[in-house]
Amino acid sequence: MTVKRERIDRRFSQAPPILQEAANSEVIFRDGWGDIVKRYDVGKLGLPADIAMLLADAFRHHHAASSHDTQRHCWMAMRAFARFAAEDGLVRSTGDLTSAMVGRYIAWLDCQVGAQTNKPWSRGSRANVLMQLRQMIDWTKRRHPSRLPERIDFPSRVWPDRQADPRLRLGAEDLKAILSVCYEDIDEAWDRFETGRAILATSGLVEGVDLELCDLVRALAVVDGGVLPSQTLAIRSGVRLSAVNRHGGLRYLGGYLHLTGETVAAFFIALAIQTAGNPDALRMMTRDCQMAHPLDEHRILVEWAKPRAGAKVKRPQKRSFDRRRPYAAPNLIDRLLAMTAPLATRASRQDRNRLFLVKSEKKSAVTLIAGSTLAHALKPFIRRSNARIALWNKAAPERSRPFLPDFAAVLLRGSVATEYYKASGGDILATQDVLNHTRTDTTIARQSG
């Protein structure tokens, strides 16, 4: 007796989309757990509606897996394009997105002047802004060519040799002066944090600490679970603002609870000089970045990721340090781990394992510190340090200290490599090891530039 079996349907069923996004000008980016990280509304840029929708779709899909910084750079580039469209007056619909419009846009970029520097935008900045628009248009060409009624092409190498001008190099004395100031700031921040831990560990008076300060630190810690509250929340919870002002203000008092935006710069600069790492790669350093040296019990390996290092196989960046030195990178990282521990529990799942965590003053959220925040923190750091050095030199002119130069984080890696190259007597292999380069020609190119 035969049994009639039903035919098995082996066709693949189409999986429903995990996240349904409405087709509008608002672009929503989410992290790996589906939580909303950032919203951008292209419709608020003042562009024509059809162009705003075109750019929003390209932005939403092309940069879905990009880093937050890349997404922000694209957003800034779209803002620049919106300013051009408003000033040009000839971009009224997608039909006006033509090769001629690209030429006018390039000429407009050549005329832009930085608000802070009062100098024309660098060739690299102009090229990056143009590249972001080109990526949006190229994505639309591939996916929705019908939305571009006119031909639009972008010329190649608009600004040749955009990195021809070599970056400035800081000398050995400059680097030593910067490190000295960083260590002073780190010691001050660590002493304040240790005092805060001693205050919170007891309900009574702490030796050498004002009683009002003890009560104030405990009151602030209770308001928001050990994280510095906003001024509004602190007042609402009964914290006396007059007492806060007498003891340096909320920002200063935050240092008794955890790492703050003012003190993170010193830690970051010191680690950037010691590791000779790329600033953005160091910013993404994780909390489990240390491991024991396989042969030397006194040395610790510090490891961090560099997304651009390696083609198909990503190779981590590593440096080893002697922990017996008081300001060696592992000891600084241990302090960072302790000072950011109260923040780590409040961070999102995506940022929870990051080392450089800070509390955002605008959003009252704990996040990985943004690259722009670090860049903006350098100016006040240099200004405060030079003011302190000026007081020192006035009080002890016979032991005067050099002032800090005006520098940016991107200058540190090349400056450290140059000093290693000089100290090794021109050994390019020693410099290659410091920079964690796989190929020697990469090191030669970086040193010559």
What do the predicted segments below correspond to?
Residues 1-251, 270:
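Charge-rich, intrinsically disordered N-terminal extensions
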